[in-house]
């Protein structure tokens, strides 16, 4: 959904990100409250926004607010006339702007803390904790993660919560809807934190809680129909993953047979993927699907390339080229139909569907100060600048769990909705080194065994994503009486709510043992299996 359109349909909370590892959780908590919100870098100029938020939340940050390179908010934030909530660093930024003092404290607070809410007796000042049930001792358990803290109140601010070591844990302006909390209400370790956020967005900001997948479907279908008109045609990039499948189903619901689902076999798909996807989309969903075998073209362009960013760019650019060529064929067919049927004919092919999600957008933002781009996502930063087709991305504002919920509402079978994600660049970013047919075959076989064993153990639906990575190293092994010198694969499985953070999955030892045994015995060229136990952060889900 386009930015201007979505803000005309939903009240929006703006989250300004200062580089905190928890920033995305603020977004998640708002969405869980059926409140639409959007995260932008802290460097965002308010004057450049084409819409006005109902409220603004300033995130935490790894920086000290007085450090020479510390990020700072646009001063216009405080003249916009909307409620503001500062979290951790956000509180300190509010204090800095309004004349308070922030210092490094001798007692750093990391972990659980108990705050005492201070009632001022004034409704607006007490609004942040209004109606929240305190614990038996009268306090409220929260999660702290800060070294600096507010040591003197800015003029016209009052204390609304404190701890023994932090007298200004939460503050409020005397007459304006500006609040700050030193703790992190967005994390699960603050049990009542979601209620604090709810008090701000609903009670203080007055946001209408209309954001839900039930409301999203008719509005997005109406938007798609308006964009495409009565005759416009769309080609859809589908891979068989949940994102593109849900996007394709939504598009098919909106414009019917004017939507053309196209799958590009780029040579770096999972084993027998093209056949499986064709069956799933045509039999289960009734979508008209064309499969284009462009594997020779992709592999020729990937020859000799090891750098993951170059792989992404090559695959993204080649992907668009193939789609444009197919669009030209469809356009020629449309022109022929127009000549034969006149006004009964369909319109031009103008749009390219992609299943871009909100985490893709977040991770592809390059902040000028506190953060750096993690990687260029295939769906966001790897497209041709001179692309002739226009992108249509109906899922761009959604998190993965929202997409799955949307799929279920669209009556997509559970075995499709629950499928693990697969990256746009495919196995090319799971092969750490040059992509060759031999390496692809090894990885396809190992990955197929891995997923088969996970399903057999009844663990597939407990895992958010699982895959095998082929490493660019060899190890000595023994097969019978012979010495081997073959490749190493890493198996990875993670659990996550939204793919912004993830924990490695704890397998029963016997399952890992069987996975390792089967791969080393059945996959020629592999003699060692390792298990990746890295969480996100510090790692990413994919290796490249």
Curated annotation (Swiss-Prot):
The record lists XMP as bound by 312, 481, 536, 542
What protein name is recorded for this chain? GMP synthase [glutamine-hydrolyzing]
- Its gene name is GUA1
InterPro entries, per this entry? Class_I_gatase-like (IPR029062), GATASE (IPR017926), GMP_synth_C (IPR001674), GMP_synth_GATase (IPR004739), GMP_synthase (IPR022955), GMPS_ATP_PPase_dom (IPR025777), NAD/GMP_synthase (IPR022310), Rossmann-like_a/b/a_fold (IPR014729)
Where do the annotations place ATP binding? 239-245
User: Taxonomic lineage per UniProt?
Assistant: Eukaryota, Fungi, Dikarya, Basidiomycota, Agaricomycotina
Record's GO cellular component terms: cytosol
Q: Which organism is it from?
A: Cryptococcus neoformans var. grubii serotype A (strain H99 / ATCC 208821 / CBS 10515 / FGSC 9487) (Filobasidiella neoformans var. grubii)
Q: Provide the GMPS ATP-PPase domain boundaries.
A: 211-419
Catalysed transformations (reactions): XMP + L-glutamine + ATP + H2O = GMP + L-glutamate + AMP + diphosphate + 2 H(+)
């Amino acid at each position: 959904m386009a930015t201007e359109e979505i803000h005309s349909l939903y009240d929006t909370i703006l989250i300004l990100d200062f580089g905190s590892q928890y920033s995305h959780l603020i977004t998640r908590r708002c969405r869980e409250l059926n409140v639409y919100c959007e995260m932008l870098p802290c460097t965002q100029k308010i004057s450049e926004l084409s819409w006005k938020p109902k409220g603004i939340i300033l995130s935490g940050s790894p920086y000290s607010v007085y450090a020479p390179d510390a990020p700072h908010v646009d001063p216009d934030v405080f003249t916009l006339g909307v409620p503001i909530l500062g979290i951790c660093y956000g509180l300190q930024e509010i204090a800095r702007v309004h004349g308070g003092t922030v210092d490094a404290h001798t007692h750093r607070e990391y972990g659980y803390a108990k705050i005492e809410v201070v009632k001022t007796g004034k409704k607006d000042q007490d609004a942040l904790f209004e109606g929240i049930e305190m614990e038996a001792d009268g306090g409220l358990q929260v999660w702290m993660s800060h070294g600096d803290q507010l040591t003197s109140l800015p003029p016209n601010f009052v204390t609304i919560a404190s701890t023994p070591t932090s007298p200004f844990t939460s503050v409020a302006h005397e007459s304006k809807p500006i609040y700050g909390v030193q703790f992190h209400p967005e994390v699960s370790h603050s049990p009542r934190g979601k209620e604090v956020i709810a008090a701000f967005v609903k009670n203080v900001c007055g946001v209408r809680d209309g954001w839900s997948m039930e409301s999203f479907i008719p509005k997005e279908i109406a938007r798609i129909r308006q964009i495409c008109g009565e005759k416009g045609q769309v080609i859809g990039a589908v891979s068989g993953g949940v994102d593109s499948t849900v996007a394709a189903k939504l598009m098919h619901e909106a414009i019917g047979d004017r939507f053309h689902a196209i799958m590009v076999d780029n040579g770096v798909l999972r084993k027998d993927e093209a056949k499986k996807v064709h069956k799933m989309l045509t039999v289960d969903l009734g979508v008209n699907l064309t499969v284009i075998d462009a594997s020779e073209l992709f592999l020729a362009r990937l020859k000799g390339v090891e750098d993951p960013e170059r792989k992404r760019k090559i695959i993204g650019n080649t992907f668009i080229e193939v789609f444009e060529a197919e669009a030209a064929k469809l356009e020629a067919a449309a022109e022929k139909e127009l000549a034969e049927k006149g006004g009964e004919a369909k319109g031009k092919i103008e749009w390219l569907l992609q299943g871009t999600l909100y985490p893709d957008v977040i991770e592809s933002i390059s902040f000028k100060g506190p953060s750096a781009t993690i990687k260029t996502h295939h769906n966001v930063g790897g497209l041709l600048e001179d692309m002739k087709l226009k992108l249509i991305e109906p899922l761009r504002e959604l998190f993965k769990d929202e997409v799955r919920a949307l799929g279920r509402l669209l009556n997509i079978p559970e075995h499709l909705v629950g499928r693990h994600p697969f990256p746009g660049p495919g196995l090319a970013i799971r092969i750490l080194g040059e992509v060759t047919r031999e390496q692809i075959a090894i990885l396809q076989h190992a990955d197929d065994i891995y997923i088969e064993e996970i399903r057999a153990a009844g663990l597939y639906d407990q895992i958010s994503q699982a895959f095998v990575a082929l490493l660019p190293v060899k190890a000595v092994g023994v097969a019978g009486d012979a010495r081997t010198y073959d490749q190493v694969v890493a198996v990875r499985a993670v659990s996550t709510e939204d793919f912004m953070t993830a924990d490695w999955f704890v397998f029963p030892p016997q399952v890992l043992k069987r996975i390792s045994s089967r791969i080393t015995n059945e996959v020629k060229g592999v003699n060692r299996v390792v298990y990746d136990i890295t969480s996100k952060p510090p790692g990413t889900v994919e290796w490249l």
